[in-house]
A protein has these predicted regions:
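Hydrophobic helical membrane-anchoring modules
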Residues: 1-2, 176-303
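Cell-envelope/extracellular polymer assembly enzymes that use nucleotide-activated donors
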Residues: 4-6, 35, 180
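Acceptor/aglycone-binding surface of glycosyltransferases and processive sugar-polymer synthases
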Residues: 63-81, 86, 98-175, 200-217
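Short, well-formed alpha-helical segments that are part of the catalytic scaffolds
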Residues: 14-28
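A conserved acidic beta->alpha catalytic loop
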Residues: 40-49, 94
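Short beta-strand/loop segment that forms part of the nucleotide-sugar
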Residues: 32-43, 63-65
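Donor nucleotide-sugar binding loop of glycosyltransferases
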Residues: 14-17, 43, 71
């Protein structure tokens, strides 16, 4: 039987969770023509030994990083080694239900999507700072990318393998991977869908997400914006500086005191930002990739 889907699970010190859920994941893969790739990101709690004990199952492939390289790099390792037309990702902490991947795949086939995101409930468990961080990231992405994805950093997604492999070089190896890979699809005008999924509380292990994760994600979003659409950052900044400079200059000019040095500095800095933005846009245009053939379909007569 030819498999069409591979599920990639990055794991770092998630032995207890994998021990609980791995048999169920493998059973699901067996009944849905799917393969499972688990990437051990340098775990030190016995994940390697646990996974080795399950390698008799032909549907399981295991890759191990010698050191902890990061969530995004673990996902990249799995996707680069995927050979099926579709690849899904989910977290190793057991909060995702592997059964929801079928919903994402159905939506992808139905809508002809290039990426489908599993949207978690808005009232999911989490601290106030964590929810605030997600809201800030979502708002920033909305302003810079004109996007309307509700759960930008969900770990459960399904991709067209050929397309996502071409976007991986633009994505970071950190926790920001989930946000950036979605934004990369949106920036290239790919068809991105979203399907509600359920999450359950973590039963074992401890989350590694913290405040610095949100800071890193914001910086990576700005970095992606600079790579793809730098004018969206430089032009607003330029306009703001020039407006401030003009507003500062008007009272001095009206009083006959000439042009203020501060006003001149603000206006010149604004002009420099505009010029830098144009140069950056030209550089971005030179390295911008074209949509691959997988994102293009040909309409044929039904007769």
């Amino acid at each position: 039987m030819l498999e069409t889907l591979t599920v990639v699970v990055p794991a770092f010190n998630e032995r207890d969770s994998l021990e609980r859920h791995l048999p169920r994941w493998l059973a699901w893969c067996a009944s849905h023509e799917a393969l499972l790739i688990v990437v051990d990101d340098g775990s030190s709690d016995g994940v390697e030994e646990l996974l080795a004990a399950h390698l008799t199952d032909r549907r399981l492939r295991v890759f191990r990083h010698r050191g902890n390289r990061g969530y995004g790099d673990a996902i990249k390792t799995g996707i680069y080694r995927t050979e099926t037309p579709y690849v899904a990702t989910m977290d190793a902490d057991g909060q995702h239900a592997i059964e929801d991947i079928e919903l994402l795949k159905e939506a992808m086939l139905r809508e002809g999507a290039d990426l489908v995101v599993g949207a978690r409930p808005a009232n999911q468990p989490g601290g106030g700072y964590r929810r605030l961080g997600k809201a800030v990231i979502r708002r920033l992405a909305s302003l810079l990318f004109s996007m309307k994805i509700r759960d930008l950093n969900s770990g459960m997604k399904i991709y067209r393998t050929e397309l996502v492999k071409q976007l991986l070089p633009f994505c970071p190896g950190s926790m920001a991977f989930s946000d950036v890979v979605t934004l990369a699809h949106l920036n290239l005008r790919c068809v991105v869908g979203e399907v509600p999924i359920q999450v359950v509380p973590r039963e074992a292990g401890k989350s590694t997400i913290n405040t610095m994760t949100a800071v890193d994600t914001v910086l990576e979003i700005i970095n992606v914006m600079m790579w793809f659409r730098p004018l969206k950052i430089f032009l607003p900044l330029s306009g703001l500086l020039m407006v401030l400079g003009t507003a500062w200059a008007v009272p001095f000019l009206a009083a006959g005191r000439g042009l203020s040095s501060i006003a001149l500095l603000l206006i010149l800095t604004g002009l420099m930002c505009a010029m830098l933005g144009l140069i950056a846009e030209q550089m971005a245009a030179g390295r911008r990739i074209d949509l691959p053939e997988v994102a293009t379909t040909e309409l044929k007569s039904s007769g």
